């Protein structure tokens, strides 16, 4: 898990459904995290 995900559990797509979290924001953060992993 990334430091960002640990710092903001609501933004972690692996944390499961969260009524307080915006699904679109979660998707954007997940894509950004994946891009960071792929690009190093």
Swiss-Prot record:
Taxonomy, superkingdom: Eukaryota
Q: What does this protein do?
A: Shows mast cell degranulation and antimicrobial activities against the Gram-negative bacteria E.coli ATCC 25922 (MIC=6.0 ug/ml), the Gram-positive bacteria S.aureus ATCC 2592 (MIC=3.0 ug/ml) and the fungus C.albicans ATCC 2002 (MIC=12 ug/ml). Exhibits little hemolytic activity against washed human erythrocytes. Its mast cell degranulation activity may be related to the activation of G-protein coupled receptors in mast cells as well as interaction with other proteins located in cell endosomal membranes in the mast cells.
What name does UniProt use for this protein?
Mastoparan-like peptide 12c
Task: Quote one Gene Ontology molecular function term.
Answer: toxin activity
Further remark, if any?
Answer: The primary structure of this mature peptide is identical to that of Mastoparan-VT1 from Vespa tropica (AC P0DQZ4), and mastoparan-M from Vespa mandarinia (AC P04205).
Tissue localization of expression is: Expressed by the venom gland.
GO biological process entries = defense response to bacterium; defense response to fungus; innate immune response; killing of cells of another organism
Q: Name one Pfam family in it.
A: Mastoparan
Q: Name one GO cellular component term.
A: extracellular region
């Amino acid at each position: 898990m990334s430091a960002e995900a640990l710092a903001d559990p609501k933004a972690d797509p692996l944390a499961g459904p969260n009524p307080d979290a915006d699904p679109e924001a979660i998707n954007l953060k997940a894509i950004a995290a994946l891009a960071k992993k792929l690009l190093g």
